[in-house]
């Protein structure tokens, strides 16, 4: 499976205890030209917990937004660029959609990483 920056996917993502996993949506945030030779992706976790919205490192996706259907997300969600992970490709279950405008995500990443 070939995923690109801006793609949403369902992946087996570890719980905070690092012992169990849950199928969760993520957003691929790594540069497309990043070719490390390793079968992995850098992703931002996505949550449906809207209490996590409103921070400069997070981007809210509301289903009423005209671009929301292309994301493949099923409910209002928050992209958390302050919760990044590197996952192995074998943990990817499937792609579900994409975000066509990455400007807000890019700004959130700059806020998170101090760039």
Where are these regions (language model features)?
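Conserved functional hotspots at enzyme active or ligand-binding sites that engage polyanionic ligands
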Residues: 1-115
């Amino acid at each position: 499976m070939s995923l690109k920056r801006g793609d949403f996917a369902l992946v087996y993502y570890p719980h905070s205890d690092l012992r169990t996993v849950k199928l969760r949506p993520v957003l691929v945030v790594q540069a497309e030209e990043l070719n490390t030779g390793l079968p992995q992706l850098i992703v931002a976790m996505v949550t449906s917990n809207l209490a996590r919205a409103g921070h400069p490192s997070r981007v809210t996706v509301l289903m009423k937004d005209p671009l929301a259907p292309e994301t493949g997300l099923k409910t209002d969600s928050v992209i958390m660029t302050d919760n990044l992970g590197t996952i192995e490709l074998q943990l990817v279950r499937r792609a579900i959609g994409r975000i066509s405008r990455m400007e807000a995500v890019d700004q959130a990443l700059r806020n998170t990483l101090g760039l």
